UniProtKB/Swiss-Prot annotation:
The gene is pgk2. It comes from Methanothermus fervidus (strain ATCC 43054 / DSM 2088 / JCM 10308 / V24 S). HAMAP family: 2PGK. Catalyzes the phosphorylation of 2-phosphoglycerate to 2,3-diphosphoglycerate. Involved in the biosynthesis of cyclic 2,3-bisphosphoglycerate, a thermoprotectant. This is 2-phosphoglycerate kinase. Keywords: ATP-binding, Kinase, Nucleotide-binding, Transferase. It catalyses: (2R)-2-phosphoglycerate + ATP = (2R)-2,3-bisphosphoglycerate + ADP + H(+).
Length: 304
């Protein structure tokens, strides 16, 4: 039996080498599942050939990296990036922002899966909880969508202001209280989590939270309006979907204004902007940015 030796809280532990576990980690780094299992089997054969009884995690990572490099250097680099993020000691709070329809939900799910983060929540869910606690009479904008919040404005916006954005900001200001509470709780409990949704707007979350080394924010955009509009057709065609297509199309003009505003805020606050055209490219961009940002900010935070 081959044992893998690692460390947790400074204490060594050993566990049996598993092709399945290794294959899963390779898949999360972007490798095809079949190829991942074949490589895991190849690594096992190599360890047996070398008569290894005990192999440290660092040694195993090096072996895997070298074998990956022989086959595909890009996958090898992705694997190392994934390992660096996984080895980060602090909980990772990942915020995926963007207007309705740009794909924050699907990207958040895929990124969470890639990084092995089990906790994920949408800002829509946070808003729904807050709606149960705060009446429509008290804060009417909370009981509207992001793109219809302007309808609830008690005082009409001045002509020089965009009423859609005035309503949106009012709506986001309230939901941000709940978002910050989730972030604070995750930091306190040491829980990694992915939060996604249109209520995540650069400049609204307190700087003391957003500037933490282990909190990362990304803004997704879809520059082409036709492509953005087409996303709603695919989003609403599922039988389980409860969101009417007509409603999104009716207010698409407002959604685009919010889309551009979030992008503008991202540029203003130096938040990474990713054009979400291709899912794989978007995920790779997020993972690469995370390693460059988190790893280089504080190398002392890593195990080893």
């Amino acid at each position: 039996m081959i044992l893998v030796e690692g460390k947790v809280a400074g204490k060594k532990y050993r566990e049996p080498f598993s092709k399945g576990v290794l294959a899963r980690s390779l898949t999360r780094s972007g490798m095809d599942p079949t190829d991942a299992y074949l490589l895991a089997a190849e690594v096992e054969s190599y360890l047996k050939k070398e008569k290894k009884k005990i192999v440290t995690i660092d040694e195993l990572v090096k072996i895997v990296y070298n074998k990956l490099k022989e086959k595909d250097e890009k996958i090898a680099e992705k694997y190392i990036r994934w390992r660096k993020i996984r080895e980060y000691k602090e909980p990772l709070i990942l915020l995926i922002a963007g207007a309705s329809g740009v794909g924050t939900s699907s990207i958040a799910f895929e990124v969470a899966n890639r990084l092995g983060i089990r906790n994920m929540i949408s800002t829509d869910m946070i808003r729904e909880v807050m709606r149960k606690m705060i009446s429509k009479e008290l804060i009417p904008s909370l009981h509207e969508s992001t793109f219809t919040a302007y309808k609830s404005l008690r005082t009409p916006a001045p002509v020089e202001f965009d009423e859609v954005l005035v309503g949106f900001r009012d709506h986001v200001n309230v939901v941000t209280v709940g978002i910050e509470a989730v972030i604070e709780r995750a930091l306190t409990e040491g829980i990694s989590i992915v939060i996604e949704g249109a209520h995540l707007v650069p400049g609204f979350i307190r700087e003391e939270l957003i500037n933490k080394n282990n909190v990362a924010m990304f803004v997704l955009t879809v520059p082409d309006e036709k492509m953005h509009r087409s996303r709603f057709y695919s989003r609403c065609r599922q039988k389980w979907a409860r969101r009417p297509l007509e409603r999104y199309l009716k207010y698409f003009w407002a959604i685009r204004r919010i889309h551009d505003y979030i992008e503008m805020q991202a540029r203003k606050h130096n938040i990474p902007i990713i054009e979400n055209i291709d899912v794989v490219t978007t995920i790779d961009s997020i993972v690469k940015s995370l390693t460059e940002d988190l790893v280089h900010k504080d190398v002392g935070k890593y195990k080893g």
